[in-house]
Design a protein with these regions (language model features):
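Nucleotide-activated chemistry modules centered on ATP-dependent adenylation/adenylyltransferase
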Residues: 1-209
Length: 209
């Protein structure tokens, strides 16, 4: 159970995608307590995502806390020197994959842990994550009592979230017409079709034949 002798702080984990956007907007509509809204910048977001974050911030007329790790993705990928273990001295973490998503820990989990510990040390923190009801595997993996999933409680599926965001005027400049997910553009969980679109787009930009 949550401790009742500490001040409760309600934090929205805001990635900027359709699910977290729908969750944030509906929480505000429902007059739910929100003390902080946190966006964790991996430095490899789609350019349109940064525009979306600014648009949401203006729409809700509230500050979105933007947190970023000390080093960017390129540095960690290619230049970071490992300090211990069998790979001590090795440069770069290499590209993340399904088994080794070091980027999630470095750019997200460790950053928000440090932020909460620093700013809300003596508080009872409750986080809100945007996981839809049709993502049972993700919901099953996240059973922490300090994390709540309003979308699942509202019985909203992913398509409901997207439609809701569209109805509020948010369209990410058409990104969801091309990609199933809008995390980092280089995310190892990106679907093959999305990776092909990124590949073709960059070939055109670079003028490669």
């Amino acid at each position: 159970m949550l401790e009742t002798n500490k001040k409760q702080i309600h934090i929205v984990s805001f990635s900027g995608g359709k699910d977290s956007t729908a969750m944030l907007l509906k929480m505000i509509e429902n007059n739910m307590q929100i003390d902080d809204i946190i966006f964790l910048d991996t430095t490899v977001e789609f350019p349109e995502m940064y525009e979306h974050i600014d648009k949401v911030e203006k729409y809700i007329n509230r500050k979105i806390t933007k947190l970023k790790a000390e080093k960017d993705f390129e540095y960690m990928l290619l230049h970071y020197e490992k300090k211990k273990g069998k790979n001590k001295g090795q440069k770069g973490y290499s590209f993340p994959d399904f088994r080794n998503r070091w980027c999630t820990n470095y750019f997200k989990k460790s950053i928000i842990r440090k932020y909460i510990k620093s700013k809300y040390r003596n508080c009872e923190v409750i986080e809100y994550h945007g996981i839809a009801v049709d993502e049972p595997d993700r919901l099953a993996k996240n059973k922490e009592k300090i994390i709540k999933y309003p979308l699942a409680e509202w019985n909203m599926i992913e398509q409901d979230c997207l439609n809701y965001c569209y109805s509020k005027g948010f369209n990410w400049d058409g990104l969801y017409e091309k990609f199933a997910r809008l995390s980092c553009w280089c995310c190892p969980l990106q679907r093959l079709g999305g990776l092909k679109i990124i590949y073709i787009k960059n070939i055109l930009i670079c003028g490669i034949n």
